[in-house]
């Protein structure tokens, strides 16, 4: 990818009309359309009058666009609604008591378990869906890696039914799909030296995931996949934070191994946080509070937690929606399908380290995308300065990036994504702020039509016929 000053700036192109073709690159059979106007931005140039935006987009989008220098945008084309979404969700409860392998194989896909050792001694579980249904060998298909967010696991990518889960849709479009798990979640509690009840085991934040976990996983995938293709990386939430930090720290490695970085609900700076719960947590000394009881793990998965959350969802759905609104989504109605939530909540939360949470609290307090703050003396030893430095996002070059967030996301807010875009815009080839979408909507939302456009874009731009 050329790295000029945005080449000709980020502009728009009209998307291709979907056809009834049964080709593996057609998205029409898997993702239906809605009638919402999006703002889509990419580098392909075409002369389109900017005045159309003023008449067709909502005020908040006009504000968003007006502050992006010299960018021309148009409203996304009209789309028809996902009419069969509720019909599919009638069958979702069958997945409620299934593990991830059972969910995948019950839909006719093959499933593989792999284990990867990191440089610093952790053993990670890595799952694979090698192409479409009954595909025995996905080794020559283009590889895709999906990395979950905080408190989540690989399960999150398959909990929303075959037609509305990113992992299944990509597999059905003949990608070799790999699902990674972060150290410390329910699948990754083994270390060469430390036990899971030790302080040392839990000394990691998203920073370590970006410099140890994902590089180990990528090396493993490229060895198993024989296509010779670089990897398309999808990250959700923390899955984007670790990639931003990882590229800054290990630029050459990622440049040589990543074909495209798709950032869903990207998290870097958190200056416009709308989450009431996280705002409260940022004012509490979590480290002191939890260290007193030697709590190094946060929100581990347990039958009690899963059963309680599922009971609340089935019997007190309004309370579930309230909690979702409190934490992450300003429009909880977008992910209020009880069947979909029941499946997702059976697999969530899956645990992470206290240090991960503290790192985000520090970012909230400092209003900067900073390295972990170990306090004065340790910072001097590690960073050679009193305060932790910011991650230098200007080091991210020549890696194509797609930024996609929701208009109603309280964590990955449009304002913070705008800041991120301006930091990365020489690399950003696609930008979408999806109306009515929140943070959890990417994993268990009612409407999946948002994925049609980016999937078409990926296929058209990176795998043209």
How should each PLM-predicted stretch be described?
Residues 432-465:
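Catalytic active-site module of serine/aspartate enzymes centered on a nucleophile-bearing elbow/loop
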Residues 222-229, 238-380:
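Alpha/beta-hydrolase-fold enzymes
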Residues 201-222:
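Alpha/beta-hydrolase active-site loop
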Residues 131-186, 191:
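Short, surface-exposed "cap/lid" segments of acyl-processing enzymes
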Residues 413-422:
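Short alpha-helix in the alpha/beta-hydrolase fold that links the catalytic acid
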Residues 403-405:
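Short beta-strand/loop motif that positions the catalytic acidic residue
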Residues 408-412:
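Acidic catalytic loop of the alpha/beta-hydrolase fold
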Residues 100-131:
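N-terminal cap/lid segment of alpha/beta-hydrolase-fold proteins
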């Amino acid at each position: 990818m050329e790295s000029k000053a945005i080449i000709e700036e980020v502009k728009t192109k009209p998307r291709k009309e979907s056809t009834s073709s049964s080709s593996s690159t057609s998205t029409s059979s898997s993702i239906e359309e809605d009638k919402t106007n999006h703002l889509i931005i990419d580098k392909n140039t075409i002369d389109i009058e900017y005045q159309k935006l003023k008449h067709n987009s909502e005020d908040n989008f006009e504000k968003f666009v007006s502050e992006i220098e010299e960018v021309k945008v148009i409203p996304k084309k009209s789309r028809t609604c996902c009419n069969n979404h509720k019909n599919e969700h009638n069958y979702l409860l069958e997945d409620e008591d299934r593990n991830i392998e059972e969910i995948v194989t019950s839909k006719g896909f093959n499933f593989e378990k792999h284990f990867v050792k990191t440089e610093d001694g952790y053993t990670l579980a890595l799952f694979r869906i090698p192409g479409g249904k009954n595909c025995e060998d996905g080794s020559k298909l283009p590889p895709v890696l999906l990395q979950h967010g905080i408190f989540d696991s690989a399960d999150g990518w398959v909990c929303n039914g075959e037609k509305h889960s990113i992992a299944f849709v990509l597999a059905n479009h003949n990608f070799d799909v790999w699902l990674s798990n972060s150290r410390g979640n329910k699948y990754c509690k083994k270390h060469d030296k430390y036990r899971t009840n030790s302080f040392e085991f839990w000394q990691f934040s998203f920073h370590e995931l970006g410099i140890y976990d994902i590089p180990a996983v990528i090396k493993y995938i490229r060895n198993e996949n024989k296509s010779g293709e670089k990897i398309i990386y999808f990250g959700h939430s923390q899955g984007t934070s670790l990639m931003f930090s990882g590229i800054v720290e290990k630029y050459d490695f990622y440049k040589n191994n990543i074909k495209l970085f798709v950032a869903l609900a990207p998290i870097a700076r958190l200056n416009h946080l709308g989450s009431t719960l996280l705002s409260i947590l940022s004012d509490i000394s979590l480290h002191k509070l939890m260290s007193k009881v030697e709590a190094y793990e946060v929100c581990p998965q347990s039958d009690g937690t899963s059963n309680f959350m599922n009971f609340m969802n089935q019997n007190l759905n309004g309370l579930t929606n309230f909690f979702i609104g409190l934490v992450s989504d300003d429009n909880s109605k977008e992910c209020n399908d009880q069947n979909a939530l029941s499946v997702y909540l059976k697999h969530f939360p899956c645990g992470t380290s206290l240090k991960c949470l503290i790192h985000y609290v520090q970012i909230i307090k400092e209003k900067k995308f900073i390295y972990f703050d170990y306090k004065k003396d340790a910072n001097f030893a590690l960073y050679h300065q009193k305060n932790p430095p910011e991650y230098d996002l200007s080091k991210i070059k020549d890696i194509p990036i797609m930024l996609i967030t929701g208009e109603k996301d309280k964590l990955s807010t449009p304002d913070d994504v705008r800041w991120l875009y301006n930091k990365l815009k020489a690399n950003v080839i696609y930008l979408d702020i999806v109306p009515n979408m929140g943070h959890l909507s990417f994993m268990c939302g009612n409407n999946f039509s948002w994925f049609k456009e980016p999937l078409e874009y990926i296929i058209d731009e990176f795998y043209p016929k």
